[in-house]
């Protein structure tokens, strides 16, 4: 009887858990969109993407000090100046190249560190994000320093795209 009850409860739990929580695929693509970009930037090189996995950091079973695209070790920081350019960064995973996590990346050209905002309860992408990883109130709705590995990849791509877009005939 106990065994049957345990099997039934486990079956119900599996049926009730959202698919993204069960299908923790690797990041297969990251897209960067922004008002100043004509077309989204896509990063799909598996060697690059190996560093930027959704299911690492707070709210997961790994306590990596740098993961996703955030330097978690520095903790939350003040909201950055509104003058910084902002970009929506979407993480896509298998199966079916689906978007499973979205954050905001803000930076200004130069050596000033960039920032990452993890959407909170009142933000558009919060629902999607918590179906993948519920990072908790210590993280959601807060700004963090961008991880230097992310900055080395994203900044040159964004700056190159912005320059290319600015010289295109309108």
Can you name each region flagged by the protein language model?
Residues 17-21:
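Membrane-interface motif at the C-terminal end of an N-terminal transmembrane signal
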Residues 6-16:
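Bacterial N-terminal signal peptides
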């Amino acid at each position: 009887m106990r065994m049957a009850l345990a099997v039934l409860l486990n079956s119900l739990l599996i049926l009730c858990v959202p698919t993204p929580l069960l299908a923790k695929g690797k990041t297969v693509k990251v897209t960067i969109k922004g008002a100043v970009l004509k077309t989204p930037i896509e990063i799909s090189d598996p060697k690059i993407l190996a560093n930027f996995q959704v299911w690492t950091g707070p709210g997961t079973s790994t306590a990596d000090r740098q993961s996703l695209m955030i330097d978690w070790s520095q903790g939350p920081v003040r909201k950055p100046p509104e003058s910084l350019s902002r970009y929506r960064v979407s993480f896509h995973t298998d199966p079916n190249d689906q978007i499973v996590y979205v954050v905001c990346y803000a930076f200004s050209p130069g050596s000033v560190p960039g920032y990452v905002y993890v959407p909170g309860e009142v933000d558009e992408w919060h629902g999607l994000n918590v179906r993948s990883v519920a990072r908790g109130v210590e993280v959601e709705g807060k700004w963090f320093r961008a991880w230097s590995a992310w900055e080395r990849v994203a900044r040159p791509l964004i700056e190159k795209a912005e320059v290319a877009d600015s010289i295109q005939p309108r």
